[in-house]
């Protein structure tokens, strides 16, 4: 029996020595080649999705990129080059697909799309094709133009992007070859070649009648809505609107480039294309077999009908077709005229008048001017809160800084009471700024409308009080009992007295927080000055005279606005939401009007009857409330 572990007999000696064999060298070479193969594979896996074709294209327009290596681009290069500047616009859900297309018009990530597509989207996300594949960027509305169904978005990033330059209006002629781009539900690009058919075609979107539109048969699907219509040079002719006609088929409209530039050049510094080159022959447009996405995206003549709910109904009107072939379109409403810093004279006057009205309102009633300024910039000029906040903060720094200096010179500022409140006001505006950004412009608009409604109701109740506004000694005495209307009259006469009623809080951090924090929060969230909150707090909790309350509030608003400006520019700049030029320019336009309006309002307070002042204030706040609450 043999036990495990034992050996049986003598084993032969192994005389084969591996290292002495002749195949040592081939095996070593093979092992080396295997290592090289794995290293090369790792490199390919790490870099397989990068596309050298677009390398170095940051901060370039599509037209510039097309002619970088050739004198005149062919259509095949156009099909391949344009899609990176075409984006998909949708919601913020993980699996949410695009609700519209869009066009990048600024290297810093400015995107134009159709307003109706994003009006009810709470968290806007933009899908951008990059050399590393499709990337999703959060975006915010910077400005809207309801009259032309346009929305300007800003990607929340500091990266640079390939973008469109605007076509010269003199190069757009009837019969011109154009290409309508978009992105489908899967995010893949689609395009159709067509031509410019006519100009000034009417289109109704809801209750809004849009004019100055182009007609083009290149638009065949709702997925092209918001996407670019480009010419053979890669320049942006306009933004597409796909509308369902009476037969259910898609009819193509385009908001032309000159309209876009006219309304948005205050925010974006557009590049403009030069004279038109020779258009490539039509025969070149059919060969795209080398591009797989083009094979999938080719449109059938006539196109599919629009997806239900995604198109818009066309209001049938007379389409202009009498322009001779080869003649350029003429749009005197949007082309020409004096511009200052990208603003038309009409826009400068409008912004100045809004600032003047806000200043007068604040000067007459010592509050409410900021509400009017913010609401006016949202409703009449279409600006988003990301741009409004820094503008209002900068305006307040100048206006309330000057007011604080005047009040300090008149020895009305109670520094011993104000200094403990400043840190709370600064903290409040910082917190409020981020809360306002988080809840979005739509919610801010509702809150602003509700706030204005409350202020209007308060003013109406004061008007309805017995003996309101009577110029008598009893009216002055009534200020001590809390009659706000007569306090206003007493302020005009310089006879206000300390408040004897109200809420008594002991000195300390709690009292400072109650007096300083709410003003900062409201200022940061709504973008208003906060004086409308701080003056009553100073009166009823601080228990001081109306003159001292206004003086103390001017100091708090000044420091809160300084903090708000710093936060808005640092946060906005670091996230790519704003660039300093636009808010600074807007502030420079509005500051003179707000300053002069404040002085004029203070004089009107001394001239007009208090009941009239309260009536004007109530009507103004009511109008703001109605407009804000009915447009959301």
From Swiss-Prot:
Query: What turns on this gene?
Result: Part of the probable 17 gene mamAB operon.
Q: Might you report a single GO cellular component term?
A: magnetosome membrane
Question: Which membrane topology describes this protein?
Answer: Multi-pass membrane protein
**Which residues make up the binding site for a divalent metal cation?**
148, 263
Q: What GO biological process terms does the UniProt entry carry, in alphabetical order? A: proteolysis
PTM comment: Subject to proteolytic cleavage by MamE.
Supply the PANTHER family for this chain.
MEMBRANE TRANSPORTER PROTEIN MJ0441-RELATED, MEMBRANE TRANSPORTER PROTEIN-RELATED
Q: What does this protein do?
A: Plays 2 roles; promotes magnetite nucleation/formation and activates the MamE protease. Despite its near conservation of a protease-like sequence, this is probably not a protease. Required in conjunction with MamP for proteolysis of at least MamE, itself and MamP. May transport a solute that controls MamE's protease activity. May place individual iron atoms into the magnetite lattice.
- This one is known as Probable membrane transporter protein MamO
> What phylogenetic lineage does the species belong to?
Bacteria, Pseudomonadati, Pseudomonadota, Alphaproteobacteria, Rhodospirillales
